[in-house]
Amino acid sequence: MSKRTLASLTAADLEGKRVLVRVDFNVPLDGNGKITDDTRIRAALPTIRYLSESGAKVILVSHFGRPKGKPVESMRLTPVAERLSELLGRPVVKTTDAVGAGAEAQVAATSNGQVVLLENVRFHAEEEANDAEFAKALASLADIYVNDAFGAAHRAHASTAGVTEYLSPCVAGYLLEKELQYLQAAIDNPQRPLAAIVGGSKVSSKIGVIETLLDKCDKLLIGGGMIFTFYKAQGLSVGGSLVEEDKLDLARSLMAKAQEKGVQLLLPVDVVVADKFAPDANAKTVAIDAIPDGWMGLDIGPESVKQFEEALADCRSVIWNGPMGVFEFDQFAVGTEAIARSLAGLTRKGATTIIGGGDSVAAVEKVGVASEMSHISTGGGASLELLEGKVLPGVAALDDAA
């Protein structure tokens, strides 16, 4: 289902109009309240700049953290407003609340081209409840709605879905449009062979993705802690590694489905095991059928990396979601980092490489190859749900393309 986008609105449509833009500024802060990664803020800049340069009054709305429906001082958007102001090279007005008389007055005083950031929308419980009156109050601040928050598009909240009942037009911003184009095309119309790399600790959190990808891809490479559930399902001893005992039958059925569909399903052949879950653990590499009792697998081994790289070599499209090991610990980050470098090499050869949100994004950034990927998704849960073939409420609520 194609949606109307910001590109369909000209400067004449936008000049002097109040445009409510849902952005995803849920960025990480350090202990001193300083932003440690401004990727999500930067990702929204093309939409903000286009609106501002077209003479619109730009009103940004975002959530930040989980304040549970009440104001929390450490979750105010002040550091975000400061960083955005630096990136835009102009002042950004931050309101003291997302709705109400104060916000209304500050928006009313806004001149064409100016940018206003509303205070954390989740300070109101009505946001996550998709309350109609709250949505109406947000909508009253604007004439036009733009959703550029892919990271929150899988939520039916007041600022992502409810407001669209009271504003028109409602369109996708540049970031949301790009996300949908890349992820949808990768699933619906990929250049083949298409490989999917799925990692992370639990099969349970990736069931939907694996099942959908088995219908779409030519090769499925599995890494991360979830591999041990597959091994145990095959009758192997996994030592003290993480296993979801209640998912053994599911693992067997996924392996059977891959075989039935002719999908090459690759599991690691060796793993790096540790005597404890810690950065300074004793570690060694063993074959998957030789994990010692009491030791736990925390990364894929060098033979597995080689095998994965060989499987990926001829692929024209690759989707990656989830790390190969516990990459927060340097000695167990080798597998994840090797896959990141391998994908950068594939991009250089003309393949389409898509990093589907979450920890995989942190991995390619840590290795310094983020700019060499075709597309890096800004949404964790949203990209997973899109890859699962689900309809995202924040997208469904937008106007259909003419």
From Swiss-Prot:
It is found in: Cytoplasm. Pathway: Carbohydrate degradation; glycolysis; pyruvate from D-glyceraldehyde 3-phosphate: step 2/5. It catalyses: (2R)-3-phosphoglycerate + ATP = (2R)-3-phospho-glyceroyl phosphate + ADP. Its EC number is 2.7.2.3. Its main location: cytoplasm. GO terms for biological process: gluconeogenesis; glycolytic process. GO terms for cellular component: cytosol. GO terms for molecular function: ADP binding; ATP binding; phosphoglycerate kinase activity. Gene3D superfamilies: Phosphoglycerate kinase, N-terminal domain (3.40.50.1260). ATP binds at residues 206, 297, 328, 357-360. The keyword Phosphoprotein does not apply. The keyword Endoplasmic reticulum does not apply. Substrate binds at residues 24-26, 40, 63-66, 122, 155. Pfam families: PGK. Keywords: ATP-binding, Cytoplasm, Glycolysis, Kinase, Nucleotide-binding, Transferase. Monomer. Belongs to the phosphoglycerate kinase family. This is Phosphoglycerate kinase.
